[in-house]
Amino acid sequence: MYQDKILVRQLGLQPYEPISRAMHEFTDTRDNSTLDEIWLVEHYPVFTQGQAGKAEHILMPGDIPVIQSDRGGQVTYHGPGQQVMYVLLNLKRRKLGVRELVTLLEQTVVNTLAELGIEAHPRADAPGVYVGEKKICSLGLRIRRGCSFHGLALNVNMDLSPFLRINPCGYAGMEMAKISQWKPEATTNNIAPRLLENILALLNNPDFEYITA
């Protein structure tokens, strides 16, 4: 079925705000004939504060901008070396509930890490994916008119020190991890294709078209 097809956009390294605006515009103007899209992107350093975010969880942002976001969740950090995947899906058309989508995204990351020999798991009390007690992937979604936007952020080979300036996702002392701690050769270039392959498998392997910026 044609509408089952997904457009995959590799956007490279981009500032947060223009991508966020584009994502909102796409979601606001899409209709039932609009193909779903997955955007793969890295962001320049930025803290984003989710809808549930509290100012006290931003400890000392320093020179890194803080931007309000309408995704679910609390504050997180994006920076180069972190693979962000935005999922712009018509949930009604794909017969997916919100909880099912969260589980699907978490499983995408768990499966990707398993291929690398890294044992990871989701947590019922704190969305995202963890290796031991350390968080390696953050998750934040918004649903509008039955369509999802925002998505996940997987730490690949980034500088983790900016996370010390916040309480990640509202948890004081939450330790963060990245793939390169176990796989020094990991980069977003070699992780993104695995991530994409795993999410498409969980979406029942729809046709897709890959577009580079």
Swiss-Prot record:
Q: Which reaction does it catalyse?
A: octanoyl-[ACP] + L-lysyl-[protein] = N(6)-octanoyl-L-lysyl-[protein] + holo-[ACP] + H(+)
What's a single GO CC term here? cytoplasm
Question: Which keywords does the record carry?
Answer: Acyltransferase, Cytoplasm, Transferase
Which pairs of positions does the record mark as disulfide bonds?
A: none
Lineage top rank: taxon: Bacteria
Which intervals hold domain BPL/LPL catalytic?
32-207
Q: Pathway it acts in?
A: Protein modification; protein lipoylation via endogenous pathway; protein N(6)-(lipoyl)lysine from octanoyl-[acyl-carrier-protein]: step 1/2
What Enzyme Commission number(s) apply to this enzyme? 2.3.1.181
Q: Which residues form the active site?
A: 169 (acyl-thioester intermediate)
Q: Where is this site: Lowers pKa of active site Cys?
A: 135
Q: Name one GO biological process term.
A: protein modification process
Q: Which GO terms describe its molecular function?
A: lipoyl(octanoyl) transferase activity
Q: Which Gene3D superfamilies match?
A: Bira Bifunctional Protein, Domain 2
**Function of the molecule:** Catalyzes the transfer of endogenously produced octanoic acid from octanoyl-acyl-carrier-protein onto the lipoyl domains of lipoate-dependent enzymes. Lipoyl-ACP can also act as a substrate although octanoyl-ACP is likely to be the physiological substrate.
Q: What is the protein name for this chain?
A: Octanoyltransferase
Q: Which gene encodes it?
A: lipB
